[in-house]
Design a protein with these regions (language model features):
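Right-handed parallel beta-helix/beta-spiral solenoid domain characteristic of secreted/periplasmic
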Residues: 50, 62-113, 249-252
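Right-handed parallel beta-helix/beta-solenoid
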Residues: 1-28, 46
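Right-handed parallel beta-helix
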Residues: 95, 101-173
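Glycine-rich repeat segments that build the extracellular carbohydrate-interaction surface of secreted
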Residues: 5-9, 30-51, 63-69
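Short glycine/acidic-rich loop motifs that flank beta-strands on beta-rich extracellular proteins
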Residues: 51-54, 75, 82, 113-119, ...
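Short, T/G/N/S-enriched strand-turn elements that build extracellular solenoid repeat scaffolds
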Residues: 27-34, 48-59, 94-96, 241-242
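All-beta strand scaffolds that present successive hydrophobic residues in beta-strands
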Residues: 42, 65-66, 102-105, 126-129, ...
């Protein structure tokens, strides 16, 4: 049966019943007693080791942790880190682990630990919606294994490596997020194939970096005013940035080096995107007549090859 537990780090007690009148003090306690379809409602305040939290916070299948989605979690700060043993990347410093069909909504997450990740998603299909991820020492959200998350309407700012990292064979919907002032806005690697739609990415080192043999689909994203590139493609990656029957709709502009840099071994085909043909590098075919096919001279050989620093692949 669906139930709601309430948590207040200032007035609550973990010996309480977790009701609205007698809330728990910690998310940790609420997660211990939560069952499928449980909602955990958080009051404004700071949730950290000093208030009694034990990290990482693992949200069980079918459980929702809810703050305030209307302001993307302003005033509800969850800050901390604990060791999570990943099947694909060994020990990691993590604030939250989300199991299948878990939901995290309307909170602010910070992980100040070395190489710290805000949310870790491994071969599960949770929802991460309308949160703020800021000052994480690696990335806000990391998805790996066979993950298939929904990452929707979040704000990612000033995270050291990436806003969002999608690795291994992960898929998922990454929609309506804002990523700024971080290393890479979104990093996609290995054989990952997520759908990126309606994201706004600006003032990062590079906006979107696609590596390995990743095959993401990009539609209606804006990547602008990044120090290096709007989109960087390396390795054997081959993103879908538009087709005749499904136009890309991506806008790449005002980036420091290139709006679109293809340093991969594949030719990219761009259809229905807004890209300045004078700000591209590598093998790119503009298949719509609105943008002339660039003839770069000399042939662009990126120096140095854009390899992320810090590397978005955890060690």
């Amino acid at each position: 049966m669906a139930q709601t537990f309430y948590v207040n780090p200032a007035s609550g007690s973990d010996t309480n019943a977790g009701s609205q009148q007698a809330p728990f003090k910690t998310i940790t306690q609420a997660l211990k007693v939560a069952t499928i379809d449980t909602k955990i409602q958080l009051a404004d305040g700071n949730y950290n080791a000093s208030s009694g939290e034990v990290f990482p916070l693992t949200v069980p299948s079918g459980v929702t942790v809810l703050g305030n989605e209307t302001n993307t979690g302003k005033g509800i700060l969850i800050e901390g880190s604990g060791t999570y043993l990943s099947r694909t990347f060994a020990a990691q410093n993590v604030t939250f682990v989300l199991l299948d069909k878990a939901e995290l909504r309307g909170v602010t997450v910070t992980n100040l630990a070395s190489r710290g990740s805000g949310v870790w998603i491994e071969s599960t299909a949770p929802t991460v919606a309308n949160n703020t991820f800021t000052n994480c020492k690696r990335e806000g959200v990391f998805a790996t294994g066979e993950a298939n998350p929904i990452i929707l309407g979040n704000l990612f700012s000033e995270n050291a490596a990436n806003g969002i990292a999608i690795a291994k064979n992960s898929k998922g919907q990454i929609q309506g997020n804002t990523c700024f002032k971080t290393g890479f806005g979104i990093a996609i690697s290995d054989t990952a194939s997520p759908i990126l739609r309606d994201n706004k990415i600006y003032e990062n080192r590079s906006g979107i970096v696609i590596s390995g043999s990743a095959r993401p689909l990009l539609r209606n994203n804006v990547s602008e005013n990044n120090t290096d590139d709007g989109i960087t493609v390396i390795g054997t990656a081959l993103p879908d940035i538009g087709s005749t029957n499904n136009l890309g709709g991506n806008t790449l502009r005002n980036n420091g080096k290139f709006d679109l840099q293809n340093a991969s071994s594949n030719k990219l085909v761009s259809i229905g995107n807004k890209i300045d043909a004078s700000k591209v590098a590598g093998s790119i075919e503009f298949a719509d007549s609105s943008v002339p096919t660039p003839t770069p001279t000399p042939t662009p050989t990126p120096t140095p090859t854009p390899t992320p620093t810090p590397t978005p692949t955890p060690t």
